[in-house]
């Protein structure tokens, strides 16, 4: 590996401070070389295909964290971690203030969570220190996608990672409710080519055989699975969660979610042995313009037909405190 450093001074509105520009050249995936350079706490990476006679040099830039910081935060993920399901920039701010380490960033939570905008992701990364796992999901309902929908997902995946997402949550199933090995393998490989985490979301809970599914995901190199133990709520699925953690917890991260709150987090973690919990920490906010004369834009039934859901900073803090009392 070749490394060069150049010290210089950088002028910001807040003042002048010393920093360095470093260059690293080392082997990358698929026989490519990877050139990285770092300025302060921001790292940019350029992947270049090997030159062939008469070929052009292709490359792309993407914003990354420093390698040391990333290693530190990835180590934290293997410890006790609270992940908050967020549907907006505002939700992410509440999660950060409440003490969350990581969020799953979505849009359209009323549909189970769809792909967030790149603008929302950039705002979260700019204004918080949260690890962000971005949802990649083009529509509501299930997880068996057409070719056009799949193409959209891969395009969105690249955009999200190029805008700083620390990982992606996704799920591909076949019509017989098995993991789609081809699409899942391609997505996992793409995510890992950016050095990010590949998270298979609760599509796992719709699979016909969870043992077969988790073994296939391990074989494909997935980093983590979000699951409720194939039940509506994680408490109801705690037996399967416990079994999966005991059998596979050393080979893949398990993240327990659905119905997790301050009242049950500690008991759920102790019973299952799972050290990562996923929660919405939701409360309802009224928007009186939701229902008009003959028009109704409600996303929830009564008594919340004029409400939308938000992340509660208080509930996040209570969850974090309860979980860390273990």
Which stretches of residues belong to each language-model region?
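Glycine-rich phosphate-binding active-site loops on the catalytic face of alpha/beta enzymes
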Residues: 104-113, 159, 163, 169-175, ...
């Amino acid at each position: 590996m070749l490394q060069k450093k150049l010290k210089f001074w950088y002028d910001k509105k807040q003042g002048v401070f010393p920093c360095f520009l470093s260059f690293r050249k080392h082997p990358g995936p698929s026989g490519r070389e990877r050139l990285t350079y770092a300025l302060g706490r921001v790292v940019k990476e350029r992947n270049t295909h090997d030159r062939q006679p008469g070929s052009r040099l292709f490359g792309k830039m993407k914003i990354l964290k420093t390698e040391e910081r990333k290693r530190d935060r990835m180590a934290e993920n293997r410890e006790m971690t609270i992940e908050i399901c967020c549907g907006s920039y505002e939700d992410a701010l509440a999660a950060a203030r409440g003490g969350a380490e990581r969020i799953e960033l979505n849009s359209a939570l009323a549909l189970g969570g769809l792909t967030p905008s790149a603008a929302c992701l950039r705002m979260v990364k700019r204004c918080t220190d949260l690890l962000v796992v971005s949802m990649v999901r083009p529509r509501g309902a299930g997880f068996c996608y057409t070719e056009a929908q799949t193409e959209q997902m891969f395009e969105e995946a690249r955009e999200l990672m190029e805008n700083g997402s620390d990982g992606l949550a996704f799920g591909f199933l076949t019509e017989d409710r098995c993991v789609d090995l081809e699409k899942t393998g391609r997505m996992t490989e793409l995510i890992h080519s950016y050095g990010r985490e590949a998270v298979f979301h609760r599509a796992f809970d719709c699979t016909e055989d969870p043992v077969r599914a988790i073994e296939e995901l391990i074989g494909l190199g997935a980093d983590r699975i979000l699951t409720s133990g194939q039940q509506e709520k994680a408490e109801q699925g705690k037996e399967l969660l416990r079994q999966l953690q005991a059998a596979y917890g050393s080979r893949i991260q398990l993240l327990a979610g659905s119905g997790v709150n301050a009242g049950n987090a500690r008991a759920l973690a102790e019973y299952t042995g799972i050290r990562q919990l996923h929660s919405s920490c939701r409360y309802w906010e009224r928007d009186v313009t939701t229902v008009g004369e003959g028009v109704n834009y409600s996303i929830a039934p009564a008594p919340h037909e004029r409400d939308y859901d938000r992340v509660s900073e208080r509930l996040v803090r209570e969850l974090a405190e309860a979980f860390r009392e273990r």
